[in-house]
Regions:
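Phosphate-binding/catalytic loops
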Residues: 81-118, 122
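Glycine-rich P-loop/Walker A and Walker A-like loops and their local beta1-loop-alpha1 context
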Residues: 143-161
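C-terminal boundary of histidine-terminating zinc-finger modules
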Residues: 111-132, 136-143, 147-149
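Phosphate-binding loop that captures ATP/GTP phosphates
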Residues: 124-136, 140, 160-218, 225-226, ...
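Alpha-helix capping/helix-boundary segments
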Residues: 77-79, 177, 252
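Conserved catalytic-core segment of NTP-binding enzymes
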Residues: 99, 157, 165-166, 171, ...
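Conserved active-site segments centered on acidic
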Residues: 1-68
Length: 277
């Protein structure tokens, strides 16, 4: 319908790759239908402002479709429609980008704000992953992400991440900017080394040892705006050129709501582990 997922994906790509020409359309879109107000508001809070004011039909977007270097669709069936239009270029569907099915976003139209945010987070993550797969994301060492399914899984997930980082000789990062880990870090006897997400990339990390963890010193509102910024991806790439990286994300579910953070913090990973105790 080109009212939620696709205009949001367009905004994410425009922020991350401003040199590219980005547009969006919908397989069943009707020209001129307004983008959903809730999507516009979420995108504003996440610093990826929606630039398309209304939906665009396939017929109106035919020129852009045929000249595109890459087309990203939400579903495999939509990819079939694009191929049937005669497009022969690179084509990726959210359904085939990563094996973890929980990453695949459903259409958020009609969802409550928290659920809509979570689905748009998935859209942002998979859109960026598809773009990186096409453009390249070179890094010398493995990026391994550990994702707690819920808050109750956090302790086990951190212990798993710590074992993985010891095995790999990796830098360990607490990527929960919304509620940085405290008690579980203390329980494992790890030393916290603070990074500031507003000055990301400045911290010297060459001497981070296997008993230390990079973590944020304070809670951050709307952490999605940082994960959707090129600076987060570039910092992880910088670290992964020094040593292997293990990232532990926020839980997919807090006690009160579903979160987008884990998807957005991890889209560039080579390896995913979801912990559900």
């Amino acid at each position: 319908m080109n009212q939620a997922r696709s205009p949001f994906a367009q905004a994410v790509l425009e922020r991350n790759f401003p040199e590219d020409q980005i547009s969006s359309t919908g397989v069943t879109a009707i020209d001129g239908t307004p983008i959903l107000d809730a999507v516009v508001e979420i995108a504003k809070n996440w610093c990826v402002p929606i630039t398309q004011s209304a939906s665009k039909s396939l017929s109106k977007a035919s020129t852009e479709i045929q000249s595109a270097d890459l087309i990203i669709t939400a579903e495999d069936l939509q990819s079939d429609v694009i191929r049937n239009l005669g497009y022969h270029g690179a084509l990726r569907s959210y359904e085939e980008i990563v094996e973890d099915r929980d990453f695949v976003p459903i259409d958020p139209v009609g969802l409550l704000p928290d659920a809509m945010s979570r689905e748009l987070g998935k859209v942002g993550a998979l859109t960026l992953r598809a773009a990186l797969d096409a453009k390249g994301f070179p890094h010398a060492h493995n990026i391994h992400v550990v994702i707690p399914h819920g808050v109750s899984d956090l302790g086990v997930a951190l212990a798993h991440a710590q074992m993985a980082r010891i095995d790999e000789g990796a830098i360990l990062i607490d990527a929960d900017l919304r509620a940085p880990i405290v008690n579980e870090i203390e329980d494992l006897g790890l030393e916290r080394i603070f990074f500031d997400v507003d000055q990301i990339g400045i911290l010297e990390t060459e001497h981070v040892n296997t008993q230390q963890i990079l973590t944020h010193p304070r809670q951050v509102d709307f952490p999605e705006r940082y994960f959707l910024s090129p600076s987060w991806r570039n910092w992880i790439q910088q670290l992964a050129n020094q040593a292997p990286v293990v990232i532990i994300t926020a839980p997919r579910h807090s006690r009160a709501r579903r979160l987008a953070d884990s998807y957005l913090a991890s889209y560039m990973a080579d390896e995913f582990t979801v912990i559900s105790a």
